[in-house]
């Protein structure tokens, strides 16, 4: 009764699909029952073959001897703690050898020449029989030490973690943002002489602590990866491409820690518009206009869903009330069978209407979201094409940075593109001056496919959509408290930002007043990550809703309303979705 294929001698073959690691069957096996062999292999053995297997039961009490071994003094062996320590050393050595044997068992068989070459190199390097064992990386080894130290401090010695509180839940990316911000704060204090040497030194120390925290989190991540997949054979669930982006299957998602990087997410419509011809640009603009018109015409149908959801809820409540009043339960099934001749009761009618209403709302939310993505991508492509068309067909007026007039020396293709652009401007609501010029701010955002709402850029749009934009021009302690209160962290603006500013950090543009800071005990009990991601999700949904629907700012739904309507879409629905999908199918198929 032994585990074959995972033997302790390190020379066994790879276990096959039937659990037998060798071509010939063992002589000790009775019969040809593979199920019995597999059941027997679940139990550990005390034989020499399975003694170094990782599946063997580790008996610690048998390793702690009562008598001192050779080479040790009686005084050192007299204490219980010293004997227990020696037993732990033996357990650690046994686990190390078991890992080595498991590695040699799972690894593929190599030729005799390769093994001879490796044995020769191992004898020269004095590594012995562990030449086939892959050592830990320095980062993973340090992460294991850090994890063991944290476990010993928090669980054994009952000490608090050095990063306890709300900031202890930050991941590597968020800690890296905090390190970058604290270092920039220290530079800002020192450059503008806003603090003395002691204050600057304290800020530098905090920045160093955050940098050390980033390194610790990176090493712990490497250690967790090693523990979850020690052989490096498992395929990762996601492949990260850019910070904040991950792919699951064929779908790309964005869950980054930076609100300012939302416009940099590659959603599939990122085109180099400067390499396209005038005819292609004109076609992209027209396609974007058709997609935008389709979305605008679809909004009344989507708004009609609220009434259908309310009717479904009323039907459900009526059915529940009727059932409770009439006592229509499973116990009264016999009475109901006798009443079949008299017709269905009110409770049965209400329940049947509820079932019919539920059966009438069947739709595919996956295709619904896919069509929304395709149409929004076409709108963004048309916007980017319009930005490039402005560069080609319009010239900037003198004395103004955002007023454009059509050029006179245009080719026939360019003139056609200018006409398409004029229709695009009229449909977008861009006013034309008396002299025939257009007032178009921030054309660069158009060329990237980022919507420009009410003459404001993308950064300003996200600031307005946030309930309260945090103030960056504060001292360190107030800044940290305010960041916890807001539930997210905002990066300082880039140095190449195109709008002029009076300071290194922007003042809030939000119309809402700045609230007073809550007490410290409330700050320490707030959940940073949940509110942080909620703010990112709300700003993104509000941006898409405001751009597609072109409604006033006060009609932007908050995250709770958006989450509720999405949940209703997943669980409920109506014929409106089928009509909507039929219309969107016709629009998507048009090319």
From Swiss-Prot:
Residues 490-507 have a biased composition (Basic and acidic residues). Residues 1-10 have a biased composition (Gly residues). Residues 11-32 have a biased composition (Polar residues). To C.muridarum TC_0268. Residues 1-37, 110-135, 324-344, 487-517 are annotated as: Disordered. Residues 110-132 have a biased composition (Low complexity). It comes from Chlamydia trachomatis serovar D (strain ATCC VR-885 / DSM 19411 / UW-3/Cx). It comes from the Bacteria. Transmembrane segments: none annotated. This is Uncharacterized protein CT_875.
């Amino acid at each position: 009764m032994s585990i074959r294929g995972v033997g302790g001698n390190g020379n066994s073959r790879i276990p096959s699909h039937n659990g037998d690691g060798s071509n010939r069957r063992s002589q000790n096996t009775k019969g040809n029952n593979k199920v019995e062999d597999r059941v027997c292999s679940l139990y550990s053995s005390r034989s020499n073959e399975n003694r170094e297997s990782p599946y063997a039961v580790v008996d610690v009490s048998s390793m702690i001897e009562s008598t001192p071994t050779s080479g040790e003094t009686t005084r050192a062996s007299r204490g219980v703690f010293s004997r227990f320590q020696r037993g732990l050393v033996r357990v650690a050595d046994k686990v190390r050898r078991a890992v080595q044997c498991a590695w040699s068992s799972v690894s593929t068989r190599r030729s005799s020449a390769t093994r001879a070459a490796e044995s020769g190199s191992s004898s020269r390097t004095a590594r012995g029989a562990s030449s086939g064992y892959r050592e830990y990386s320095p980062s993973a080894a340090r992460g294991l030490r850090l994890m063991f130290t944290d476990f010993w401090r928090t669980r054994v010695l009952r000490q608090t973690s050095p990063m306890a509180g709300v900031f202890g839940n930050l991941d590597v990316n968020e800690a890296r943002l905090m390190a970058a911000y604290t270092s920039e704060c220290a530079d800002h204090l020192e450059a503008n002489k806003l603090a003395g040497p002691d204050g600057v030194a304290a800020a530098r120390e905090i920045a160093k602590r955050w940098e050390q925290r980033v390194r610790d989190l990176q090493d712990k991540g490497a250690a967790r990866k090693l523990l979850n997949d020690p052989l490096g054979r498992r395929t990762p669930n996601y492949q990260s491409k850019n910070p904040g982006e991950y792919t699951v299957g064929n779908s790309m998602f964005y869950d980054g820690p930076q609100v300012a990087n939302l416009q940099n997410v590659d959603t599939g419509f990122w085109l180099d518009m400067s390499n396209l011809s005038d005819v292609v640009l004109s076609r992209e603009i027209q396609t974007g206009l058709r997609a935008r018109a389709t979305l605008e015409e679809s909004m009344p149908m989507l708004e009609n869903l609220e009434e259908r959801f309310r009717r479904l809820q009323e039907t459900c409540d009526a059915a529940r009330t009727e059932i409770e009043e009439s006592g229509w339960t499973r116990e009264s099934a016999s009475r109901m069978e006798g009443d079949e001749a008299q017709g269905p009761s009110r409770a049965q009618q209400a329940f049947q209407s509820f079932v019919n209403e539920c059966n009438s709302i069947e739709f595919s939310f996956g295709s619904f979201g896919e069509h929304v993505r395709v149409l929004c991508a076409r709108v963004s492509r048309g916007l980017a094409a319009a930005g490039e068309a402005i560069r080609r067909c319009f010239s900037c007026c003198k004395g103004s940075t955002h007023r454009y007039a059509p050029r006179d020396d245009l080719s026939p293709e360019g003139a056609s593109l200018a006409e398409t652009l004029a229709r695009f401007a009229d449909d977008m609501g861009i006013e034309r001056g008396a002299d025939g010029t257009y007032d178009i701010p921030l054309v660069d955002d158009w060329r990237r496919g980022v919507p420009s709402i009410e003459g404001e850029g993308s950064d300003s749009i996200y600031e307005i959509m946030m309930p309260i934009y945090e103030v960056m021009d504060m001292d360190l302690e107030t800044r940290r408290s305010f960041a916890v209160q807001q539930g997210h962290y905002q990066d300082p603006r880039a140095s190449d930002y195109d709008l002029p500013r009076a300071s290194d950090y922007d003042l809030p543009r939000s119309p809402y007043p700045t609230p007073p800071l809550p007490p410290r005990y409330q700050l320490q009990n707030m959940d940073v990550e949940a509110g942080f991601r909620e703010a990112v999700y709300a700003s993104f949904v509000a941006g898409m809703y405001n751009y597609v629907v072109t409604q006033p700012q006060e009609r932007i739904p908050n995250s709770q309303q958006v989450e509720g309507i999405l949940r209703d879409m997943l669980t409920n629905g109506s014929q409106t979705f089928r009509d909507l999908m039929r219309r969107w199918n016709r629009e998507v198929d048009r090319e």
